[in-house]
Structure formats: structure tokens, C-alpha cells
């Protein structure tokens, strides 16, 4: 696929996001399902598609830290905690950070924090930059199924109508590690 074709596909995916659709896209280890984090309709569609309870909360993936700032309470982090985050980004570490009071519950679930990551996958970087904000990010798989690692697997699990950003997953074998930004506690091994 040449760059011009990829841009056309990217433009279609951005258009789908603006129309509050759920999309699939390659990440560092698996394909992700994503949508506009500010659209309750899109998030509810994603949760229903994934068969995931809203109470668990979601992850936001971004091109840079500035895209995450409207959703997280950065003032709760001290300089050392912030430096620790920045030393792992862009990269496969997801950090749980206190959320802003106005961050929608459809993102935080039953928590007062939000899981966020600045991705180093070039297509995720490009997609978030083009869209202008982060995306909800959860692994593309139905409950009880393995996460999808190819476009074909996405089509098998979710059907042909789901918009999929063409591309390949990165070389990681495991999903992102998840850590608490305040305590350093590891919630999920990467």
C-alpha cells in the first residue's frame, strides 16, 4: 500500500470517528477498537460490540501528552511521577492517572481515575494527530475470544461493516502494561 492510499484510508477512518462510529486499528501488539472519547453514543456502541461492562472503565490512547490533559488531573502528579510517565512514552505502558472531575463516567467507569497511553505505533500516532484528540482503546475481540492481530481476524469477529484502518500491529506479543501513576503499582504485566 502506498502513502497516498494509506492517507485515503486514514481520511475514511477519521470521517467515521466524526460520525460517532466505532473503528478498528493496529496498535503495538493487537488490533484495537476505538471511538471518540467525547461521544457517549460511540462509547456505548463500543461497549456493546465488545460486550464489556461500563464499570470497568476504558483506556485512552493519544499521539502526545497534550491530547490527554483535558481528561486527566495533571496537578495530582508530582515532578518525579510526571518524569516517570514521560520516560516510558511514547511506548507500550498505560498509566492510570486521577481523572478531571468533568471527565465523563462512560470513560472512567466506577473509578475516579483514567487509564491513558501515548502510543509509539506510527498509525496510532498518525490517526490521533489527524483526528486531533485521543481515542478510546480496547483490544479488538469479543468476550471470550483472543484479541485480533490481523485485519482478517477483525473482519471474522466483527463483520465487514466495521471500519478498519489498514496496517500491521507492532512487534509486541502482550498488550500494554498498566501501572498506577501515583503509586507505581502494576495492574497488568506487559
From Swiss-Prot:
Residues 7-190 form the YrdC-like domain. Its main location: cytoplasm. It catalyses: L-threonine + hydrogencarbonate + ATP = L-threonylcarbamoyladenylate + diphosphate + H2O. It is found in: Cytoplasm. GO terms for molecular function: ATP binding; double-stranded RNA binding; L-threonylcarbamoyladenylate synthase; nucleotidyltransferase activity; tRNA binding. One of its GO terms (biological process) is regulation of translational fidelity. Keywords: ATP-binding, Cytoplasm, Nucleotide-binding, Nucleotidyltransferase, Transferase, tRNA processing. It comes from the Bacteria. Its EC number is 2.7.7.87. GO terms for cellular component: cytoplasm. Required for the formation of a threonylcarbamoyl group on adenosine at position 37 (t(6)A37) in tRNAs that read codons beginning with adenine. Catalyzes the conversion of L-threonine, HCO(3)(-)/CO(2) and ATP to give threonylcarbamoyl-AMP (TC-AMP) as the acyladenylate intermediate, with the release of diphosphate. HAMAP family: TsaC (MF_01852). PANTHER family: SUA5 (PTHR17490), THREONYLCARBAMOYL-AMP SYNTHASE (PTHR17490:SF18). This is Threonylcarbamoyl-AMP synthase. It comes from Yersinia pestis.
Amino acid at each position: 500500500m502506498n502513502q497516498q492510499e494509506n492517507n485515503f484510508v486514514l481520511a475514511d477512518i477519521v470521517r467515521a470517528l466524526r460520525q460517532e462510529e466505532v473503528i478498528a486499528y493496529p496498535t503495538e501488539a493487537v488490533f484495537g477498537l476505538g471511538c471518540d472519547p467525547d461521544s457517549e453514543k460511540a462509547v456505548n456502541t463500543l461497549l456493546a460490540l465488545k460486550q464489556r461492562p461500563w464499570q470497568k472503565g476504558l483506556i485512552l490512547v493519544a499521539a502526545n501528552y497534550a491530547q490527554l490533559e483535558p481528561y486527566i488531573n495533571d496537578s495530582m502528579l508530582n515532578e518525579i511521577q510526571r518524569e516517570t510517565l514521560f520516560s516510558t512514552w511514547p511506548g507500550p505502558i498505560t498509566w492510570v492517572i486521577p481523572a478531571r472531575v468533568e471527565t465523563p463516567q462512560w470513560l472512567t467507569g466506577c473509578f475516579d481515575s483514567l487509564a491513558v497511553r501515548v502510543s509509539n505505533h506510527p498509525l496510532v500516532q498518525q490517526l490521533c494527530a489527524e483526528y486531533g484528540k485521543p481515542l478510546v482503546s480496547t483490544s479488538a475481540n469479543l468476550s471470550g475470544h483472543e484479541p485480533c492481530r490481523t485485519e482478517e481476524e477483525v473482519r471474522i469477529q466483527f463483520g465487514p461493516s466495521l471500519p478498519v484502518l489498514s496496517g500491521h500491529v507492532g512487534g509486541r506479543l502482550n498488550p500494554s502494561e498498566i501501572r498506577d501513576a501515583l503509586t507505581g503499582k502494576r495492574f497488568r504485566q506487559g
